[in-house]
């Protein structure tokens, strides 16, 4: 199943433009970013390139970093990936390790590039694996605290009500993918962070 998912993700990956924008903000990751249909307008006037694709896992991010991310020479990378790893039963340590390897590869090639890690969603469909989601998020938050070029951003508060219950109105019927109001909440949290990182 993992092989089939990786193959499907590779086939779904969009091709980079012949002359892509460089020096901007690149969004990498899985469907949460890929399906953010109003990303560019909600982040305007920030220069956004979105190379996320459905079904991707953290191993895909490692495979594409040299060919599809580093050539764009982004000033900032927004990273959301790991949710599909969780669904496949991967342990937190393995997921975290691949995320850190991605960051380290970027830092080696582009030492001035900032990486903004967006927390993995505690989606209702994965409630039985929230402990893994929380562990990955916690480990990356700790990593970011000791690496000045990395920032951790928690978007999960958008997805829960005042009683700590998931806001099902923000999810599609699969209780995994998000409706437009969820992305509005994400933009309110993420845009100030990216604006600051891009301006530094």
What are these regions (language model features)?
Residues 80, 118-119:
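Alpha/beta-hydrolase-fold catalytic nucleophile elbow
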Residues 19-101, 124-134, 138:
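Conserved SGNH/GDSL esterase-like catalytic core that processes O-acyl groups on lipids
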Residues 46, 75-76, 113, 147-150, ...:
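Secondary-structure boundary/capping positions in well-ordered alpha/beta enzyme cores
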Residues 1-28, 32-44, 71-72, 108, ...:
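N-terminal secretory targeting modules
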Residues 51, 118, 153-156:
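Conserved beta-strand termini and adjacent loop/short-helix elements that scaffold enzyme active sites
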Residues 96-118, 135-150:
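Charged, glycine-enriched surface loops/patches
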């Amino acid at each position: 199943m993992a092989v089939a998912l990786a193959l499907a993700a590779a086939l779904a990956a969009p091709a980079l433009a012949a002359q892509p924008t460089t020096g901007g903000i690149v969004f990498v990751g899985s469907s949460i970013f890929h399906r953010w249909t109003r990303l560019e307008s909600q982040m305007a006037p920030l220069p956004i390139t979105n190379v996320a694709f459905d079904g991707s896992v953290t191993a895909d991010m490692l495979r594409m970093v040299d060919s599809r991310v580093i050539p764009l020479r982004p000033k900032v990378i927004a990273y959301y990936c790991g949710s599909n790893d969780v669904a496949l039963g991967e342990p937190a340590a393995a997921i975290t390790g691949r995320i850190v390897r991605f960051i380290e590869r970027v830092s080696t090639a582009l030492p001035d590039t900032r990486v903004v890690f967006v927390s993995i969603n505690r989606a209702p469909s994965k409630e039985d694996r929230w402990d893994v989601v929380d562990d990955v998020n916690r480990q990356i938050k700790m990593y970011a605290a000791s690496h000045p070029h990395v920032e951790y951003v928690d978007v999960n508060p958008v997805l829960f009500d005042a009683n700590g219950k998931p806001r099902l109105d923000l999810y599609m019927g699969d209780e995994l993918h998000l409706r437009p109001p969820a992305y509005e909440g994400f933009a309110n949290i993420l845009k100030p962070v990216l604006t600051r990182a891009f301006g530094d």
